[in-house]
Amino acid sequence: MTVILGIDPGSRITGYGIVRQEGCKLTYLGSGCIRTKVDDLPARLKLIYAGVSEIITQFQPDCLAIEQVFMAKNADSALKLGQARGVAIVVAMNLDLPVFEYAARQVKQTVVGSGAAEKSQVQHMVRTLLKLPANPQADAADALAIAITHCHVSQNALRMGSGGLNLARGRLR
């Protein structure tokens, strides 16, 4: 049994989702959003740090799966996203949790079957895969999709043995 915390980082809204994996079975444990309503970026990062710390304390995950930074058209937005992402990674690393990173296209491909899927499609598939009564909010759905992707990738790596996949701390290599 493994508990995975998925994080969809953002400087204003950071989504989180927690799933438990037992073999091929996934169980929804919780999800939500850390909302930072202050304008000051350092204060927002502090709120993200506190929020992720609280989630880890509450759910005791075995690892953290997080979305990789993508190339944004707005450099300022990309920098803020990277900082929010870095805060979540630091929290996990300070608590000795392994961190795994996944590209947004890989997450969409794994959960929906298309790397170009729309947010609504991700929400629908997360709802279906986890047997939820309603679609989760978009950022929480993305975080759950990241956790589901990690479950899928780690399960495939176990099936393949050491056949080229190395699930070490950090990126899937």
UniProtKB/Swiss-Prot annotation:
Report one GO cellular component: cytoplasm
List, in alphabetical order, the Gene Ontology terms for molecular function in this entry.
crossover junction DNA endonuclease activity; DNA binding; magnesium ion binding
The cofactor note reads: Binds 2 Mg(2+) ion per subunit.
> tRNA processing: present as a keyword of the record?
no
The family database entries (Gene3D superfamilies) matched by this protein are listed as:
Ribonuclease H-like superfamily/Ribonuclease H (3.30.420.10)
- Keywords annotated in UniProt: Cytoplasm, DNA damage, DNA recombination, DNA repair, DNA-binding, Endonuclease, Hydrolase, Magnesium, Metal-binding, Nuclease
Alphabetical list of InterPro entries matching this protein: RNaseH-like_sf, RNaseH_sf, X-over_junc_endoDNase_Mg_BS, X-over_junc_endoDNase_RuvC
- Enumerate the cofactors the protein uses: Mg(2+)
Q: Which GO terms describe its biological process?
A: DNA recombination; DNA repair
Q: Which residues are involved in binding Mg(2+) 2?
A: 67
A Pfam family of the record is: RuvC
Catalytic activity, reaction form = Endonucleolytic cleavage at a junction such as a reciprocal single-stranded crossover between two homologous DNA duplexes (Holliday junction)
Q: Which PROSITE patterns match?
A: RUVC
* E.C. no: 3.1.21.10
Catalytic residue positions: 8, 67, 139
Q: Subcellular location, in the record's words?
A: Cytoplasm
Coarse class of the primary localization is cytoplasm
Protein family: Belongs to the RuvC family.
The UniProt function text for this chain reads:
The RuvA-RuvB-RuvC complex processes Holliday junction (HJ) DNA during genetic recombination and DNA repair. Endonuclease that resolves HJ intermediates. Cleaves cruciform DNA by making single-stranded nicks across the HJ at symmetrical positions within the homologous arms, yielding a 5'-phosphate and a 3'-hydroxyl group; requires a central core of homology in the junction. The consensus cleavage sequence is 5'-(A/T)TT(C/G)-3'. Cleavage occurs on the 3'-side of the TT dinucleotide at the point of strand exchange.
According to the record's subunit comment, the protein's assembly and interactions are: Homodimer which binds Holliday junction (HJ) DNA. The HJ becomes 2-fold symmetrical on binding to RuvC with unstacked arms; it has a different conformation from HJ DNA in complex with RuvA. In the full resolvosome a probable DNA-RuvA(4)-RuvB(12)-RuvC(2) complex forms which resolves the HJ.
Matching entries from HAMAP family are given as:
RuvC
Report the protein name in the record. Crossover junction endodeoxyribonuclease RuvC
Organism of provenance = Sodalis glossinidius (strain morsitans)
Lineage, opening ranks? Bacteria, Pseudomonadati, Pseudomonadota, Gammaproteobacteria, Enterobacterales
- What gene, per UniProt, encodes this protein? ruvC
